[in-house]
Amino acid sequence: MALERTFSIVKPDAVKRNLVGEIYHRIEKAGLQIIAAKMVSLTEAQASGFYAEHEGKEFFGPLKEFMTSGPIMVQVLEGENAIARYRELMGKTNPEEAACGTIRADYAISMRYNSVHGSDSPESAAREIEFFFPESEICPRPAE
């Protein structure tokens, strides 16, 4: 199977609680490589652009407010079937429905403060990666 890339965010609630290292450990333990990463503080304009597909929905304002409330970690993950593997590792959006041992089951506070984001398709992964990372900042690692 070919390598695939996905996009991941460690959200403000998890960064504030110093969970970045724990989440990165789980990502790598799951066989995914972090090939780009940086800490950013989103502006309201950036949050609006990133979440443009949700504009007009009831949760759009609160989502922007949350995502601009503190720094986030954004990263590009690479591995076989990376999108599905990372989504399984994250668990369901609602932490009460997330399987035991998933990131959201273990660390999320609520549906809004659910610690992580991951792309849901190859198309969204490409768009989200491009939003934060020029190709020059992505550093694929050699196969072992």
From Swiss-Prot:
Keywords noted in UniProt: ATP-binding, Cytoplasm, Kinase, Magnesium, Metal-binding, Nucleotide metabolism, Nucleotide-binding, Phosphoprotein, Transferase
Active site per database record: H117
Binding residues annotated for ATP, in chain numbering: K11, F59, R87, T93, R104, N114
EC main group: transferase
Its EC number(s): 2.7.4.6
Record's catalysed reaction(s): a 2'-deoxyribonucleoside 5'-diphosphate + ATP = a 2'-deoxyribonucleoside 5'-triphosphate + ADP; a ribonucleoside 5'-diphosphate + ATP = a ribonucleoside 5'-triphosphate + ADP
InterPro entries noted in UniProt: NDK-like_dom (IPR034907), NDK-like_dom_sf (IPR036850), Nucleoside_diP_kinase (IPR001564), Nucleoside_diP_kinase_AS (IPR023005)
Cofactor dependence: Mg(2+)
GO molecular function: ATP binding; metal ion binding; nucleoside diphosphate kinase activity
A cellular-component GO term for this protein: cytoplasm
Subcellular location, record wording: Cytoplasm
Gene Ontology biological-process entries: CTP biosynthetic process; GTP biosynthetic process; UTP biosynthetic process
Domain of life per record: Bacteria
Subunit structure: Homotetramer.
Protein function: Major role in the synthesis of nucleoside triphosphates other than ATP. The ATP gamma phosphate is transferred to the NDP beta phosphate via a ping-pong mechanism, using a phosphorylated active-site intermediate.
Family in the record: Belongs to the NDK family.
Protein name: Nucleoside diphosphate kinase
Organism of derivation: Vibrio atlanticus (strain LGP32)
